[in-house]
Design a protein with these regions (language model features):
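Short, conserved catalytic or adaptor-binding loops enriched in Gly and charged residues
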Residues: 1
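Acetyl-CoA-dependent GNAT
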Residues: 4, 8-12, 22-32, 36-99, ...
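Alpha-helix N-cap/helix-start and coil->helix boundary motif
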Residues: 11-14, 133-134
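Hydrophobic pocket/interface hotspot
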Residues: 17
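C-terminal "cap" of GNAT-fold acetyltransferases
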Residues: 62, 87-89, 123-137, 141-171
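Conserved glycine-rich acetyl-CoA-binding loop
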Residues: 93-111, 118-120, 130-138, 142
Length: 171
């Protein structure tokens, strides 16, 4: 674990973040999304989004790197959900390259996000997770998140509808 460094993202990281996002999302959603939707998860479609997020700190973005290579990232900020108290934060995204799954990178990123949310005055944090993404569900539950069963919603990803549920915990 000590080999990973977590730090705030810079504009130079946008391309690497987009690549991590694409490869990790493709691995996470294989079997959940059809091939044409997985193919649409290309880094080129995400780089501008992450560049803008880093530039304007919305969301705040931290990266995990080893040997100068970005292997994971987390985006977090105040909750985007309507009618949510200003003390509620949200993990907007947390992705790690599949070859680094289970090695503590996600935990290090979550710790950095929790520290950042605490600095922002957040007392609780949420994340939306597709019900069929068992790996993500397990990760967040091991990190202390609890399912809010009354929050289930359907989100369209391209032509596919995905059932999501919000998880929540104290910061």
């Amino acid at each position: 674990m000590s080999d990973y460094e977590v730090r705030p993202a810079t504009l130079r990281d946008a391309k690497a973040i987009a690549e991590v996002h694409a490869v990790a999302a493709r691995a996470a959603y294989e079997g959940i999304l059809p091939e044409d939707q997985l193919s649409a998860l290309a880094p080129t479609t995400r780089e501008a989004k992450w560049r803008e997020a880093i530039e304007f700190s919305e969301p705040q973005v931290q990266v995990a790197e080893i040997g100068g290579e970005v292997v994971g990232f987390v985006g977090f900020d105040r909750s985007r959900d309507p009618k949510t108290p200003s003390t509620t934060g949200e993990l907007w995204a947390i992705y790690v390259k599949p070859e680094h799954w289970g090695k503590g990178v996600g935990v290090a990123l979550w710790d950095a996000a929790r520290d950042g949310l605490e600095e922002e005055g957040c007392t609780t944090v949420t994340i939306w997770v597709p019900l069929r993404n068992e790996r993500a569900m397990r990760f967040h539950e091991l990190a202390g998140f609890k399912r809010e069963m009354k929050t289930a919603k359907t989100t369209a990803i391209g032509s596919v509808k995905i059932e999501e549920i919000r998880l929540k915990r104290s910061v």
